[in-house]
Amino acid sequence: MSNSTLPSTDSIKLTEYSHGAGCGCKISPKVLTTILASQLPVFTDPNLLVGNQSRDDAAVYKLNEEVGIISTTDFFMPIVDDPFTFGRIAATNAISDIYAMGGTPMMAIAILGWPINKLPAEIAQQVVDGGRQACMEAGIMLAGGHSIDAPEPIFGLAVTGQIALTDLKQNDTAKAGDRLYLTKPIGIGILTTAQKQKKLKDEDSHIAVNAMCQLNSIGAQIAKINGVNALTDVTGFGLAGHLLEMCQGAKLTAKLKLDAVPLLPRALDYLAQGCVPGGTHRNYDSYGEHLPELTDHQKAILCDPQTSGGLLVAVSSEAEAELVALLNANQIEPICIGSLEAPTTATNVVLC
């Protein structure tokens, strides 16, 4: 297709050019286990403090006795139609992994796949500018990148960060008695699916976008609280999936207060209209055996894939007040969704 026959920039809806959306594109945990099961001899490096063994949010390399380097990458297909907003969301989501380890970002490089015979280069430029905007908000440079001709639009970042090793937080170091806090509401997958199904009302189009564009920069401050024992962000595997990683890594059971889980406005309305992303079903098929028996409604909430979702924090009861004060001071509603305890059942999550 020549440039003269490409669609006009005003008529383009990016979600129509991809088979999936946002972190809902992630390969399911079960399939990912197969992919990562290497047949090669194990190679270790004592300075690699966090690798993929615990499926944490990023890799951490010990630079010296005090400082570590954090490295992560994240990219996906369009979750919204507007190119600038897509780029901003994708970049915000990628940078989040640095904050989820308790670190601060240093720089980023872009990852771009673009169907050059289907979409004008000017649209890709807007996507990259959205990524630049998110990087600016995080206080870092978009320092370079790599692009390929691809059948569907893809954008994301590889991000480098730093961490004081005393502040390093992981997803598998929670302790019995910890309280669980979530910093963003659930329901992004439901609302973005409503958009893809053309059911989303214009007056609701900002709800998921505003949540996805909110940086998780509070993670760097949360990590400085001594009683915060584990930290992760909630993304494509849904709240249940990332909570399971936290529980299984620390050999604990979560008592989850389902009624306390915050939901985005109108999420339940669109759920009632059947706006359930395919990633929800893939998530449940991958880890449902580790959950208690759930209704379809409960599955749709707990397994809803989030894009640029919030932080899941495990904090000791002694440090809980300090965490609540920090969240309040940063205009984040402190919402306790449950607690962790020594295993008492065959499942890793108990609803209460």
From Swiss-Prot:
A Pfam family it matches: AIRS
Residues holding ATP: K26, S54, R55, D56, D74, D97, G145, H146, S147
GO CC terms of this entry: cytoplasm
A GO molecular function held by the record: selenide, water dikinase activity
Cofactor note: Binds 1 Mg(2+) ion per monomer.
E.C. code: 2.7.9.3
Cofactor(s) needed: Mg(2+)
Site entry (Important for catalytic activity), positions: K26
Enzyme class: transferase
Biological process terms in GO annotation: selenocysteine biosynthetic process
Disulfide links within the chain: none
PANTHER family reported for this sequence: INACTIVE SELENIDE, WATER DIKINASE-LIKE PROTEIN-RELATED, SELENIDE, WATER DIKINASE
Role of this protein: Synthesizes selenophosphate from selenide and ATP.
Entry similarity comment: Belongs to the selenophosphate synthase 1 family. Class I subfamily.
Subunit text: Homodimer.
Protein name: Selenide, water dikinase
Species name: Shewanella oneidensis (strain ATCC 700550 / JCM 31522 / CIP 106686 / LMG 19005 / NCIMB 14063 / MR-1)
Gene: selD
